[in-house]
Amino acid sequence: MPYLLEMKDITKQFGVVKAVDNISLTLEAGQVLSLCGENGSGKSTLMKVLCGIYPVGSYQGEIIFSGETLQAKNIRETEQKGIAIIHQELALVKQMSVLENMFLGSEWGRFGIMDYDAMYLRCQRMLAQVKLVVDPHTPVSELGLGQQQLVEIAKALNKQVRLLVLDEPTASLTESETAILLDIIRDLRNHGIACIYISHKLNEVKEISDHICVIRDGRHIGTRPASTMSEDDIIAMMVGRELKELYPHEAHHIGEEILRVENLCAWHPVNRHIRRVDDVSFSLKRGEILGIAGLVGSGRTETVQCLFGVYPGRWQGDIFIKGQAATIRTCQQAMKLGIAMVPEDRKKDGIVPVMGVGANITLAALDDFTGAFSLLDDAKEQSIIVQSLARLKVKTSSSELAIARLSGGNQQKAILAKCLLLNPQILILDEPTRGIDIGAKYEIYKLINQLVQQGIAVIVISSELPEVLGLSDRVLVMHQGRIKADLINHNLTQEKVMEAALRSETHVTS
């Protein structure tokens, strides 16, 4: 069968740096090819070349699509050829309806008069293809992330797509939403539509792919049939070494109780009769890693937001730090009590995107660098920034580079560096490795182990059960705002955690 896509000897440079170095790949119609590699490996750059974001002339090499040389000057030209890309950050206009988004820039009509009836029927057909049952007039802002993802795919299908590029499509989706998306991709494959799938979730890569292509440091390491590769094989090719144990677990001493929470309740910020956290009580000891598991909406994030003083609604309950009653209504109060937090949404709550990497790291500890007359000690601040970047292995060309320009993994490590400058006794990590590559995950896991060896208590929330089980000494399981189980992590399985989350009993301990 002739190839639908051939990329031959593609090289893309930024100055003297080769982001993509002589990469070639092929893809047949109806195939799914997964691209794997650490952040900064060149995956996204290669796809931007393919999709016309980097126009012909800005790179070396040749692209052949459907038997013809592709010389796209912009993304519109590649879309006209049948190539579409869906980014992790969705490109929908939230204030507009599903229908308006689907036809944005390609509206149907004559003489300046829109044919809304025809567009409505077409929109319904495209939504049916992705098995999404919503009214086309529904504002996108009223849809969940999984539904928005399907609208993006329907929008691509409306443009007669033949090759769909999906960049981290499930990073913010629940397990059920992910399952729906993977089913849609299988259906597209059965209809002859090819897909290039980029993801750090190797279980998904294995499940959905026909072939897996690994890129490292801008170079093509290898492409193999997915059926011949294990997750360990993929990891070894991605990082250039074998990770003997993804979740390194160093021996550490668990000490006395440092945190106790009693009868914590939190109400929905808008629908104030709804409890998001319902009578939650638990404790945490020095040097302990406490995992909190549960489905999305179970109350995990709301619980730790209360502990850090950032929950947006009304809440009540008793919090004790080292046996003393604590008042926490602001994050400043929490930090003074020795609590630091890496938030769930790093781009929204964890960084100031336009500020430099260094300025973000020291932002919460500026008092430590302030001398006489409230003047900032620049030399002292810069020294601490250099130490923090080295300790957390943050990869950046300059501490003054805007943090938004770093990869997700390096942004997360910079946020951790900011937290550690506070010398916390309790560190809360909400989805600490979401959307980051396997190498950066491993470094964060090692850091967590180092911190608990120093006696710091750590709370980890993750939607990835293997991560919770791989890191935690003890696991709290939450469901509908309540703690359903408090489990010692000894031979604990994913099945047992999910059973605890869904059972009818109010509380289980082990």
From Swiss-Prot:
GO cellular-component term (any): plasma membrane
Top-level enzyme category: translocase
Binding site for ATP: 37-44
Protein name as catalogued: Xylose import ATP-binding protein XylG
Enzyme Commission no: 7.5.2.10
Record-stated family: Belongs to the ABC transporter superfamily. Xylose importer (TC 3.A.1.2.4) family.
Sorted UniProt keywords: ATP-binding, Cell inner membrane, Cell membrane, Membrane, Nucleotide-binding, Repeat, Sugar transport, Translocase, Transport
Its biological purpose: Part of the ABC transporter complex XylFGH involved in xylose import. Responsible for energy coupling to the transport system.
Annotated ABC transporter domain residues: 5-242, 259-505
GO molecular function list: ABC-type D-xylose transporter activity; ATP binding; ATP hydrolysis activity
Main location: membrane
Oligomer status and interactors: The complex is composed of two ATP-binding proteins (XylG), two transmembrane proteins (XylH) and a solute-binding protein (XylF).
Organism the protein comes from: Yersinia pestis
Encoding gene (name): xylG
Catalysed conversion reaction: D-xylose(out) + ATP + H2O = D-xylose(in) + ADP + phosphate + H(+)
The UniProt record lists the keyword Manganese: no
SUPFAM superfamilies (alphabetical): P-loop containing nucleoside triphosphate hydrolases (SSF52540)
Membrane topology, record value: Peripheral membrane protein
CDD domains xrefs: ABC_Carb_Monos_I, ABC_Carb_Monos_II
Intrachain S-S bonds: none
Keyword Cell inner membrane listed: yes
Subcellular location: Cell inner membrane
